[in-house]
Swiss-Prot record:
Provenance organism: Gluconobacter oxydans (strain 621H)
Name of this protein: Na(+)/H(+) antiporter NhaA
Family: Belongs to the NhaA Na(+)/H(+) (TC 2.A.33) antiporter family.
Known function: Na(+)/H(+) antiporter that extrudes sodium in exchange for external protons.
The organism's place on the tree of life at top rank: Bacteria
One Pfam family cited in the UniProt record for this chain: Na_H_antiport_1
Gene Ontology CC entries for this record: plasma membrane
GO BP, sorted A to Z: regulation of pH
Length: 403
């Protein structure tokens, strides 16, 4: 009697293990936060997100409520996973040579500069909005990957790898921006502690120490020191990930084990919690014409216009100058469609918005801009790739610029 249900159960298991499943759960949790924030249970939702949770030994700058622990604590694991992914690609994947690194890196830099300039141009004359310039600079791989997988053969394996590498570089550049521009005032004794712990982690790597508790302990100490240093504490995930061994077969196995252990935690707990805690905002008083205000308009245009122009323009220019080559089986039309998808900014964009406009009335309009820009980028990118004529810029099977 239960046999007919076996295939369905198998499909569910595959879905839950896929990136699409994680993206769906993140979207579901985010929608739940938004719905609760605009329901009769809004007060309970706010009470939950601001529930006091403070440990005196962490000092004045330590997280003091549930939402802060998610953003400043658990999100450290997200940045750790980002670094682990790029390390795996560098060791044995699509970034294993300088030539392979160059193409997505150039696109990521272009996709960072142009959206930031677009935002600053739109918000010119609004000094209170200036700090949000970094909100539209990142691409969210959690949402772009399921879309390109759903498109099947319309996106070549080489183009898929390029987009994923670009999204990873985007996240890394976003981390650098957060560390440099969104920290607090510097406290030199804590910075010295950060340097010493980082040196110890590097020493452990150089000494080929494979004991994970050493890196885990170092990461926790680093996070604690970063709280008082003035740099953002999530930088601990970046530094710890960079210091994990990966130079030989045993190190690569260690890296794979850590990644396989932490990634599901980030996919199914950390990111959904982040979306649930940060997307919830009251829609009371919001009107469509509010999207024409400087902050949401700047973010929306930065994502849906600045991002594809920056990514596609920088990549195409580097190909024309013969600095890099297109991935095998990739056309310029396909490249443009993928550049449109790069405007899907969610996790990092929300993260930066919370830092840029913390305690400001601009946080809700900023989130509106993120949602609108990301949704429009997803729709335009999907439609372009789905309905683009197959004879538009025939792909080159060897890479390079199609002739």
């Amino acid at each position: 009697m239960t046999a007919p249900f076996v295939p369905a159960a198998a499909h569910v298991r595959r879905f839950l293990k896929s990136s699409a499943g994680g993206a769906f759960f993140l979207l579901l949790a985010s929608l739940a936060g938004f719905v609760l924030a605009n329901s009769p249970w809004a007060a309970g939702y706010r009470t939950l997100t601001t529930l006091p949770l403070k440990f005196p030994f962490l000092g004045k700058r330590g997280p003091d409520n549930v939402a802060a622990w998610v953003s400043d604590g658990l999100m450290t694991l997200f940045f750790l996973v980002v670094i682990l992914e790029i390390k795996k690609e560098i060791v044995s994947g699509h970034l294993s040579s300088l030539r392979r690194v160059a193409l997505p890196l150039i696109g990521a830099v272009g996709g960072m500069v142009v959206p930031a300039l677009t935002y600053l141009l739109v918000t010119w004359g609004h000094p209170e909005a200036t700090s949000g310039w970094a909100i539209p600079v990142a691409t969210d791989a959690a949402f772009t990957l399921p879309i390109i997988l759903a498109l099947g053969r319309r996106v070549s394996p080489g183009a898929r790898a390029w987009l994923m590498a670009l999204a990873i570089f985007d996240d890394v550049l976003g981390i650098v921006v957060i560390a440099l521009f969104y920290g607090g005032s510097m406290y030199w004794p804590a910075l010295l502690a950060v340097v010493l712990v980082t040196a110890a982690l590097i020493g452990a790597n150089r000494g080929r120490i494979r004991t994970l508790w050493a890196y885990g302990t170092g990461g926790i100490l680093l996070w604690t020191a970063l709280l008082d240093s003035g740099l953002h504490p999530t930088l601990a995930g970046v530094i710890t990930g960079l210091c994990l061994p990966a130079g030989d077969a045993k190190g690569a196995a260690t890296l794979d084990w850590v990644s396989s252990a932490v990634t599901p935690l980030v996919t199914w707990i950390v990111l959904p919690l982040f979306g649930f805690m940060n997307v919830g905002m009251s829609a009371a008083g919001m009107k469509p014409d509010m999207m024409l205000e400087a902050v949401p308009l700047g973010i929306m245009l930065g994502l849906m216009l600045g991002k594809p122009v920056g990514v596609f323009g920088a990549t195409l220019l580097s190909i024309r100058l013969k600095v890099v080559m297109l991935p095998a089986g990739t056309s310029t039309g396909m490249l443009f469609g993928l550049s449109l998808l790069c405007g899907i900014g969610f996790t990092i964009s929300l993260f930066v918005a919370n830092l840029a406009f913390s305690g400001s009335d601009l946080i809700a309009p900023a989130k509106m801009g993120i949602f609108a820009g990301s949704a429009l980028s997803a729709l335009t990118g999907w439609f372009w790739l789905r309905f683009m004529p197959q004879n538009v810029t025939r792909p080159s099977e060897e890479g390079g610029f199609p002739r």
